[in-house]
Amino acid sequence: MCGIIGYIGPRRASPILVEGLKRLEYRGYDSAGIAVLNEGRIEIRKGAGKIDELVGKLKFQEIPGNIGIGHTRWATHGVPNDINAHPHTDCTGKIVVVHNGIVENFHELKEELLKKGHVFRSDTDTELIAHLIEENLRIIKNFEDAFRMALLRLKGSYALVVLFADDPERLYIARKDSPLIIGIGNGEMFVASDIPAFLAYTNKAVFLDDGEYGIVSRYEFIVKDIVTGFPKIKDVVTISWTLEMAEKGGFDHFMLKEIYEQPRAIKDAIYGNIEAIKEVAEVVSNYDKIIMIGMGTSYHAALVGKYLFQRFTKTPVIVEEASEFRYEYEDIIDKDTLVVAITQSGETADTVAGIKLAKNKGAKVLGIVNVVGSLATRIADITLYTHAGPEIGVAATKTYTTQLMVLTLLAMELGKKIGTDVSEIENILPRLPEIIDSALGLNEKIKGIAKNILPKHDLFYIGRGINVPTALEGALKIKEIAYVHAEGLSAGELKHGPLALIEEGVPVISIAPSGKTFEKMLSNIEEAKARGGYIISLGDDIRLSEISDEWIRLPKLPEEITPIVYIVPLQLLAYHLAVLRGNNPDRPRNLAKSVTVE
């Protein structure tokens, strides 16, 4: 992985490829390159490093030609260097490939091709795809057939685009377990791993499904089944968000912009789901075996969902990381199971695999997804959209709070069916965007706290009940973008081990809203303070000011709503700490926005 762009049309391809790659930078990468076909010759320029550096050094944008492909790479096979950067070619230099994913039978196929005389230049699994097509072309003279036969040999995951020097009018594309999208322009076509790469030119898109390949020319495309070769009918999706929504809009970083977009995003999540929530509640109200799955931040949303569903519907809920679910629950799920799969991108490999497993076992699958048209939305039985809009920063912010909002709305609707009183929360929902806006008003105070804890190497986040996931998410944000060790845990666990790590000056961030466990939280805070902990408390009770070094005062709210509001100051804290440490919060090291390999 990580980013793919392809273009065919009347314009010079290279500037469009460079622009597309820059719009995919948020996905994370260690190297980049482009290949452009012009007058029967493919020119490749690539290297390790950032796109701006490579453009300056290698002059990507100067390559002539109207058809080309580009890639940003995140190393999986082979170290990040100039040779391993994509694109890759066969022995003849006529077949050029960019690829996201992992070829699991790489070593077996490479050994076979080496015996047949192929010479490999890199350590990547991608290069063998070009050689495999080349080998097939020796026997099968039709390039499409040679391409499809190569796909049938590959095991693992891939999204790939192939450029063939002898066919200057077409791009060849394929997908299995890694996203790939066709952008339909006016006399031009785009191919990309994510929508922002081509959104400046068109908002019309076709999403490839697993097991499909395609042939793309200037004026048309055809998508076929890899196994049968039969054509498939594909729907054209109109992307509802704009390129401006995917720009910084005057903020220093996408992450800060997206934190500040949360009042709007929450409003859209509420009012964009009024009818959908009722319809979904009708479908899922009779399930009493519920499993929620997700990865990373989406897993934390699932943990909050568990508390919400259990409180409102009185139904026990299992929450599992999607990467574990697919291996441990195969014999547990059946037609009486509701699986709630939460994924921002709709392409998270482990979550998509979990959905497929659940479907194969006859379970009903509800997807909670941000990206319209993504794979999860196409394979789930029903989908609720979070309506967060594009999120470019790698660390999830507004997509998390909108996931929580959707889960809250659904749990309330289901609760009403059994007579649960949700009127207090219903009454406060119209004010929720305003409440989040007031939390954003604490930005300068939180920036000051970030300066105070800047020298610290360990942070501890504690919460109870529905805010244990808030502690986990707050700690994750610190790890993701500030690169500081942080641990989130139930406050009740402190005395069972972690308290041994609390010493003079160690920051302890306490999520402590009023509620049934507040008195217990006060006791836990006192325990940490007695060991010298530097106490930062979030809550509404004045007593927190007396036992805390820093008190982030938030309004008194129904406990079920607090995870949506209380995470906002923690997002700001992580952001400011990252910036103070000299990090780019939009592009944290070693991380990708959408994890499309397992």
Swiss-Prot record:
Gene3D superfamilies: Glucose-6-phosphate isomerase like protein, domain 1, Glutamine Phosphoribosylpyrophosphate, subunit 1, domain 1. The keyword Transferase applies. InterPro entries: GATase_2_dom, GFAT, GFAT_N, GlmS/AgaS_SIS, GlmS/FrlB_SIS, Ntn_hydrolases_N, SIS_dom, SIS_dom_sf. Keywords: Aminotransferase, Cytoplasm, Glutamine amidotransferase, Repeat, Transferase. Residues 2-219 form the Glutamine amidotransferase type-2 domain. Its EC number is 2.6.1.16. PROSITE patterns: GATASE_TYPE_2, SIS. GO terms for molecular function: carbohydrate derivative binding; glutamine-fructose-6-phosphate transaminase (isomerizing) activity. Residues 280-420, 449-588 form the SIS domain. Its main location: cytoplasm. It catalyses: D-fructose 6-phosphate + L-glutamine = D-glucosamine 6-phosphate + L-glutamate. The keyword rRNA-binding does not apply. GO terms for biological process: carbohydrate metabolic process; fructose 6-phosphate metabolic process; protein N-linked glycosylation; UDP-N-acetylglucosamine metabolic process. It is found in: Cytoplasm. GO terms for cellular component: cytoplasm. The active site is at 2 (nucleophile), 593 (for fru-6p isomerization activity). Homodimer. Catalyzes the first step in hexosamine metabolism, converting fructose-6P into glucosamine-6P using glutamine as a nitrogen source. This is Glutamine--fructose-6-phosphate aminotransferase [isomerizing]. It comes from Pyrococcus furiosus (strain ATCC 43587 / DSM 3638 / JCM 8422 / Vc1). The gene is glmS.
